[in-house]
Regions:
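Conserved short alpha-helical segments that host acidic/polar catalytic motifs at enzyme active sites
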Residues: 1-221, 226-284, 290, 378
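Short, well-ordered loop/turn and helix-capping segments at boundaries between secondary-structure elements
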Residues: 20, 147-150, 197, 307, ...
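A conserved beta-strand->alpha-helix junction
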Residues: 65, 134, 139, 309-320, ...
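Generic beta-strand/beta-sheet core signal
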Residues: 110, 173, 181-182, 193, ...
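Secondary-structure transition/capping motifs at alpha-helix termini
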Residues: 130, 150-151, 281-285, 303-310, ...
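Phosphate/diphosphate-binding loops
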Residues: 159, 207, 214-215, 219-223, ...
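Short, glycine/charge-rich flexible loops or terminal/linker lids adjacent to PRPP-binding catalytic cores
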Residues: 306-351, 362, 389-395
């Protein structure tokens, strides 16, 4: 369903290109394809080999950039960013890419993820004389690079990356080089493509399709790619890797036409609907999915059960951005404005409502009420992921247990709270099976922490909400 009314949001998306005469224009198109990953800000920095030039602003890509602004960014290399605020707060100064100028040259950074040791590193750097211009955790990397004391930029970057903990997919650009880095756990998706002689990098492969690039491969955990006039080469900044891609990328965040580690997102969601149907028995008249991210799963559920699939809920695509706000009252109003039941489909019917997840419960409760007000006899809520009981510290805006309804309610209590006739969640094992990763480790290469509480990295105290610290004691 829509992030605007869900309150479950990815931090951002990144796109970069090197070796193309229209680098900024290609990046603009790439960012548009990643708009679902962040709607609060957008920016592009381009290089002509001598200088870095940037444009950024708050709002959607089309609100920040006119054609004239894009044309004011000449050069053969560019990086871009779309942002949803989860760490450091909003505001123009935190919109990325962040651009820094010094006597030794310029540096631009774009980041998807969340650094769980940013606070302690910032205190350490400030003690050494660093002055921070933003409240974004991304700026920490810039100061670490500049204070590295090593001879080459590559060595400075490697040393800086070795000090970071958490989730990060970084694009790092100077006047003459683009570097790409993914954290040792590979928590966020990042892929490499090729457009003619140019190299592209993006948070999702759907961006390559939009700009006409050919997918090459996914960036590996702990890998640093260096792209310049000599081509692209790969090095390691960490050998201690443990692939743990965020499972919610498949469940909700990524576009259905994207592939992550060779697995198509639409296909994974459809299989999750099929798997959920195998794990339960239900008698109903119609299956409907909550637009947009649950449509694939609903189709799979309908195919597996033989219950007809219908468009029982319609999304209003023309509501303004007033509701892209991180407040509960606007989320509730947003549900009403963004979704409408189709009375002719649900009236007098036993309805299976397929959705991808329940975070706070507000959305599910209001949709169930909508369907019943439209005449549904029964509403059976089927969730194609396990209950989300644990906060995410890796770049998703669920950083406290208090805001997760499944952390304090049983499935039956939650069913009563949302007013459903039944409520069923997909099992952890079923979700792993549906996604279909090779069993390369105990968690099949996925981060399942929001469901299981087993985090792939150490969770530092300064990352946690005070209430959650007490629970961990």
């Amino acid at each position: 369903m829509l992030a605007e009314v869900r309150g479950l949001n990815e931090e951002c998306g990144v796109f970069g290109i090197w070796g193309h005469e229209d680098a900024a224009q290609i990046t603009y198109y790439g960012l548009q394809s990643l708009q679902h990953r962040g709607q609060e800000g957008a920016g592009i920095v381009a290089t002509d080999g001598k200088h870095l030039h940037g444009v950024k602003g708050e709002g959607l890509v089309t609100e920040v950039f006119t054609q004239k602004k894009v044309q004011e960014l000449p050069g053969f290399g560019a990086i871009g960013h779309v942002r949803y605020t989860t760490a450091g707060g909003g505001g123009y100064e935190n919109v990325q890419p962040l651009l820094f100028h010094s006597q030794s040259g310029s540096l631009a950074l774009a980041h998807n993820g969340n650094l769980i040791n940013a606070t302690s590193l910032k205190h350490q750097l400030e003690g050494q004389g660093s002055i921070f211009q933003t409240t974004s955790d991304t700026e920490v990397l810039a100061h670490l690079i500049r204070r590295g004391g090593f001879g080459t930029m590559k060595d400075q970057v490697k040393h800086a990356l070795s000090m970071l903990k958490g989730a990060y997919a970084f694009l790092i650009m100077t006047e003459n080089e683009l570097m790409v880095a993914l954290d040792p756990n590979g928590l966020r998706p990042l892929s490499i493509g090729q457009l003619g002689e140019a190299f592209c990098v993006a948070s999702e492969t759907c961006a390559f399709d939009i700009v006409g690039a050919k997918f090459i491969r996914d960036v590996e955990p702990g890998e640093l790619l260096i792209i310049n006039k000599d081509g692209m080469r790969s090095e390691r900044f960490s050998m201690a890797t443990n692939q743990s891609i965020c499972t919610m990328e498949y469940v909700y965040f990524s576009r259905p036409d994207s592939d992550i580690h060779g697995i198509n997102v639409h296909s994974a969601r459809k299989r999750s609907g099929i798997q959920l149907a195998k794990e339960m028995n239900i008698e109903a008249d119609v299956v409907t999915g909550v637009p947009d991210s649950s449509i694939s799963a609903a189709i799979g559920f309908a195919e597996a059960t033989g219950i007809p699939y219908e468009m029982g809920l319609i999304k209003n695509r023309y509501v303004g951005r007033t509701f892209i706000q991180p407040s509960q009252s606007l989320r509730e109003q947003g549900v009403k404005m963004k979704l409408s039941p189709v009375r002719g489909v649900v009236e007098g019917k036993r309805v299976v409502m397929v959705d991808d997840s329940i975070v706070r419960g507000t959305t599910s409760r209001r949709i169930v009420k909508m369907l019943k007000d439209a005449g549904a006899l029964e509403v059976h809520v089927c969730i194609t992921s396990p209950p989300i009981k644990n906060p995410c510290y890796y770049g998703i805006d669920t950083s406290t247990r208090e805001e997760l309804i499944s952390a304090s309610h049983s499935a039956e209590e939650l069913r009563q709270a949302i007013g459903a006739d039944s409520l069923t969640f997909l099992s952890v094992e079923g979700l792993i099976e549906a996604i279909g990763h090779e069993k390369q480790n105990s968690h099949c290469g996925q981060c399942l922490a929001c469901f299981t509480g087993e985090y792939p990295t150490e969770i530092l105290p300064d990352t946690m909400h005070p209430h959650d610290k007490e629970l961990m004691c």
